[in-house]
Amino acid sequence: MTTLTHIPQGTPITLESIGKRYGNRTVLDNLQLRITAGQFVAVVGRSGCGKSTLLRLLAGLEAASDGTLLSGNALLSHAKDETRLMFQEARLLPWKKVIDNVGLGLRGHWRDDALQVLDTVGLADRANEWPAALSGGQKQRVALARALIHRPRLLLLDEPLGALDALTRIEMQGLIERLWQQHGFTVLLVTHDVSEAIALADRVLLIEEGRIGLDLAIDLPRPRRKGSAKLAALEAEVLERVLSPPQGIEASRQGIKASRQGTATSRRVAN
């Protein structure tokens, strides 16, 4: 297996007062975030909290309702060509062979580069096969190769391992971590798997009520040994916070409960 060469260093990111609304529904609310170049950040939170929305804003697929997205002193949109997004589904074109899926949209002499990135993810020998012949994990490796061929400085991962079996998922986690260590691009990983977030990231963010509710540095040496006491303690800390209702939601629940109790008391007095 060869390594991909000449990937530039990661993209630094600054989000200033980012808001995102869909009609009357606010998904992100005055979100503030700074990510240094080359950092590996995992984003967790309940379903519908805005994790994937954040990635779409960073990828330039949607525009923020409020605020500014920056890379250094320039708008992040200027780095769009150096940004790649991977989804839970590999999204390979079934009528194109593996190597052609990797080089999708490229012009000129790209086939040698495509073979190189396929070798990087361990699939050079499958270059001329059809996607239907690949397993789910292999399809995601092809999707990763398709991202790598563009020499990304920012890699956005939206639950790319969520549909894989446990063993394949661990293998893919190791591959992503090795490539990140070798090439230094910035990574944002959205995941529902807290153990995955702790195993891979330098930093874990929890989004709740449209804002960063927790920003936890994962100061553990790599490679991280699964089952270690420190890893388990961090997993428990993040999981407890994810499962705890945000203060605003809890206050709303208490208000509703008090209102109902007050109404019930009034009825008893009236009777």
Curated annotation (Swiss-Prot):
Disulfide bonds: none annotated. Coiled coil: none annotated. GO terms for molecular function: ATP binding; ATP hydrolysis activity. It is a peripheral membrane protein. It comes from the Bacteria. Residues 260-271 have a biased composition (Polar residues). It is found in: Cell inner membrane. GO terms for cellular component: plasma membrane. Residues 13-234 form the ABC transporter domain. Pfam families: ABC_tran. InterPro entries: AAA+_ATPase, ABC_transporter-like_ATP-bd, ABC_transporter-like_CS, ABC_transporter_ATP-bind, P-loop_NTPase. The complex is composed of two ATP-binding proteins (SsuB), two transmembrane proteins (SsuC) and a solute-binding protein (SsuA). NCBIfam families: PRK11247.1 (NF008420). Part of the ABC transporter complex SsuABC involved in aliphatic sulfonates import. Responsible for energy coupling to the transport system. This is Aliphatic sulfonates import ATP-binding protein SsuB. It comes from Yersinia pseudotuberculosis serotype I (strain IP32953). The gene is ssuB.
